[in-house]
Amino acid sequence: EYDSENLMYALIKEIISSKRFACLNVICHLPLNMLIKDPKLLNDKECQYAMNPATHLDFLIYNRVSKKPVIAVEVDGYAYHKDHSKQAARDRLKDHIMALYGIPLLRFKTNGSGERERLIKVLEKVVQ
């Protein structure tokens, strides 16, 4: 959808194609309501947000065998995700929901750097 997401997808695919991450795969734009099947941990506001068909994760890296989520990845546009914006509030809501369900969420800013190293470091911890 966005160049920054296309670049991140290519990076994720490249990283998980290595032998040490062969057990992993990635899904793009996964609706949150397909991941959170039982919203009992959520309050009304969180539930409304999570069950909205438009609410999605940019990427979900999961275990190929168990199909269990390993880590979610979000690419945040610099201007769109400014502090105190509506999107920043939704980001915090999504962060909280993912934490409630024990799924790590890694955010990358479009004006950031070191993405490869950060992602590999996190994946190495979860694959051990």
Predicted regions and their residues:
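Nucleic-acid endo/exonuclease domains
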Residues: E1-A72, A79-Q128
